[in-house]
Each structure stands twice: as C-alpha cells, then as structure tokens.
Amino acid sequence: TIFPSGRGKDPELQITDEQFRGLLDFIVRMRETKKIHASFSCEGFLGEYEGKVRDHYYTCQAGLSIASVLCDGSISACTSIRSDYHQGNIYKDDFWEVWENKFEPYRNREWMKKDECADCKVWKFCKGNGMHLRDSDGKLKLCNYKKLYK
C-alpha cells in the first residue's frame, strides 16, 4: 500500500522504498509512451519525480479548493482525512460558514512544521504533505520524499 490507513497501516502491506521508486518509474514510463494515462495521487512531494508522475506539481488542496460532504453529513476538507479533522456537519452547520471560517488549519499549515518537518529542506514545496497523511495528534505518518531520498 502507499497510503498507510486502515488495513494499509499493517507493515506487511507496506511497499518497500525500492518498490515505491519502481512504481514511480513505471508511471513515468507509461506517461512517456502514452499507452496508459497513469498518474500519481496527492500523496506528498516527490522531488525529482514532480512534473513526471502527475499533471501538476504537488499541493494538498484540502480546504483550499476542495471540500467534501460525507454520507453522514460530515463536512471535510477531503474524503481521505481522519474524522477528527472534520469541521462540521451539513445537518447542523452552514456549509459556507464552515468553508469561510473553519478551514484555517488547512490554509495555514505552519502547525505542521514540527517533528521531522521542522528542519526539512523541501518544506516550501511540501508544506507538511497531505492532510490525510497525519494522525490524530497531527504527526506525519509517512513522508514519501524521505522514502525516496534517505
């Protein structure tokens, strides 16, 4: 797995650093041949792979240009983030009010610049990775940049 959530958190299901690089190399090759339109998701900054494995450079758009209403009515900045990051419920809260006033943690990510991100040389490109890669304490669960460039 690439995204360590749910059953994917099991270390037995995690891909190795070598497999991860192989996956990205495969995506690059497929995009060059144009036989398959392969694209890597918003799983964080990828260094030299940026511009080669997806149609845009990495940004986490959760709360910036993306908001979601989930099946239970929860208002979330992204369907992939943890429920403790939800900012309201459509049955109780005004969506526009939530969008305008409660998504600040997504728009100002300085709170993420801690632990392994505190002194990261690519912070200005990464901004702490995707919100879905944070645990309930805000700690980063996975850094794909580190996975590639240890």
Spell out what each predicted region is:
Residues 1-76, 80-86:
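Radical SAM enzyme [4Fe-4S]-AdoMet core and its adjacent flexible, acidic
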Residues 80-150:
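Flexible mid-to-C-terminal extensions adjoining Fe-S/redox cofactors in radical SAM and related proteins
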